[in-house]
């Protein structure tokens, strides 16, 4: 195994023995840090001095550990990546500049021109446009399954398929796919299952690795940061996929950029993470700022506390809205009648009571707009997982670029509202909704 050293390093304890709440604080801290600092240091540097020419050459051929350039790695970011990998139980993590950059980096390291990825129909609008526009221009075909039934995914897979892709909880519909069955289908075809686990809150609510996923992408901007103060994404390599099955010569084959180096033979079960870093970050430049990595580290220390509060607030808000005369429908996976409740209860903590819900109001689009514009406490933004309550109108924001037909496939209606409760007292959130309803229904 080559000596690349910017993955999980400086371990002073076995994280697998620790509970999530302990790992979110201790993982990624270097007990041997020479200053004795309790916190992680921020390294605002673009480059690093090489001790001699031989050392520099070794770094660039990936035969020795060390820092090269912050586009590839940074000590602050390395600490953050180690914490994320420990929370998920992955072999390595690669931080990126946004959730979208995590997706595009991961998928372009899996598929090439003329190959395809089979994906869920229930996707975040930005992801849908990435699939429909940018990846298509790169020659990568995205085959959207007609439903989330695993059998529909299976029918689209052929010898050119290089991954199966889904969200652990669809955005914005909150539908939960059968992750375990999708994993079985992907593995039968010899390809990895990639799960966007943004709604799974860094593995606290849902850890797809426990159910057969091979690669996880996550928008760290949401629950990982938790305060709307930083952008970031993350790719986590579960270390379980067999890259030597003949379908991935870009990983188990000679690397054009590294004089024929075979990443799988050199790096073993973390080969995909290495690929994302030394090819993906190098060529696409999707690296995060060390300042943002630091803010993600701070956010992670309170993640379980925040998410537990937000899940409970979501439950109480859903119960309030279900009985309100101004509300036509409430889509909340915590309700037994929700079509995804069974899957949510299987894959998510707290009996599947997720951190987001959707509602449709009585009336038309104008009524919906009036309600949103009348909110005083909740913010009208394209955000979830923030410390403040966020209400989003997907049809005019996150899914605006989609056609009406594509919106319908994604579960987005003209009057749908996505609600992500924050850390405020739930009684204040409900009071804000009540006064907005009164104004909207005048």
Where are these regions (language model features)?
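Short amphipathic alpha-helical segments
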Residues: 65, 91, 292, 296, ...
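Conserved N-terminal alpha-helix of the aminotransferase class I/II PLP-enzyme fold
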Residues: 52-104, 126-134
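Conserved PLP-enzyme active-site core in the AAT-like
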Residues: 15, 24-33, 93-323
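Structural beta-strand/beta-sheet cores of well-ordered domains, especially the beta-sheet scaffolds
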Residues: 23, 40, 46, 191, ...
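N-terminal "arm"/small-domain region of PLP-dependent enzymes with the aminotransferase-like
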Residues: 14-74, 82-83
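Conserved C-terminal alpha-helix-loop-beta "cap" of PLP-dependent enzymes
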Residues: 307, 315, 319-322, 326-417, ...
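PLP-dependent enzyme catalytic core of the Aspartate aminotransferase-like
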Residues: 3-11, 114, 132-133, 141-143, ...
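Short, acidic Gly/Pro/Ser/Thr-rich loop/turn segments
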Residues: 32, 49-53, 242-243, 303, ...
């Amino acid at each position: 195994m080559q000596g690349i050293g910017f993955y999980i390093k400086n371990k002073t304890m076995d994280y697998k023995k620790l509970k999530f709440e302990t790992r979110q604080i201790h993982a990624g801290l270097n007990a041997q840090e020479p200053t004795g600092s309790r916190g992680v240091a921020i390294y605002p540097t673009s480059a690093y001095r090489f001790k001699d020419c031989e050392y520099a050459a070794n770094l660039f051929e990936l035969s020795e550990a060390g820092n090269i350039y912050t586009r590839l790695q940074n000590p602050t970011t390395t600490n953050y990546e180690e914490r994320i990998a420990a929370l998920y139980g992955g072999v390595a993590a690669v931080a990126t500049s946004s959730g979208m950059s995590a997706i595009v980096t991961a998928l372009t390291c899996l598929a090439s021109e003329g190959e395809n990825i089979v994906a869920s129909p229930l996707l975040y609008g930005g992801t849908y446009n990435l699939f429909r526009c940018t990846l298509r221009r790169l020659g990568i075909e995205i085959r959207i399954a007609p439903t989330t039934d695993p059998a529909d995914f299976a029918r689209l897979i052929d010898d050119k398929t290089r991954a199966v892709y889904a969200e652990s909880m669809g955005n914005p519909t909150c539908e939960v796919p059968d992750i375990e069955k999708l994993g079985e289908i992907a593995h039968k075809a010899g390809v990895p299952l990639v799960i966007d686990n943004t709604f799974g809150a860094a593995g606290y609510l849902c850890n797809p690795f426990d159910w057969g996923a091979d690669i996880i992408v996550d928008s760290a901007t949401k629950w990982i940061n938790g305060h709307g103060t930083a952008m970031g994404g993350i790719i986590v390599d579960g270390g379980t996929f067999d890259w030597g099955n003949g379908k991935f010569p870009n990983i188990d084959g000679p690397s054009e950029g590294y004089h024929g180096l075979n990443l799988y033979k050199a790096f073993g079960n973390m080969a995909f993470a290495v690929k994302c870093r030394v090819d993906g970050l190098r060529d696409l430049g999707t690296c995060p700022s060390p300042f943002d990595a630091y803010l993600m580290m701070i956010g992670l220390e309170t993640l379980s506390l925040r998410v537990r509060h937000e899940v409970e607030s979501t439950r109480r808000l859903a119960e309030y809205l279900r009985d309100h005369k101004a509300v036509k429908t409430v889509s909340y996976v915590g309700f037994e009648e929700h079509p995804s409740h069974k899957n949510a209860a299987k894959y998510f903590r707290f009996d599947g009571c997720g951190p987001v819900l959707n509602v449709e109001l009585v009336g038309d689009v104008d009524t919906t707009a009036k309600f949103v514009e009348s909110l005083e406490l909740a913010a009208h933004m394209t955000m979830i997982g923030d410390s403040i309550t966020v209400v989003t109108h997907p049809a005019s924001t996150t899914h605006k670029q989609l056609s009406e037909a594509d919106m319908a496939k994604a579960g987005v209606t003209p009057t749908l509202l996505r609600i992500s409760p924050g850390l405020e007292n739930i009684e204040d959130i409900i009071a804000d909704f009540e006064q907005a309803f009164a104004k909207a229904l005048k």
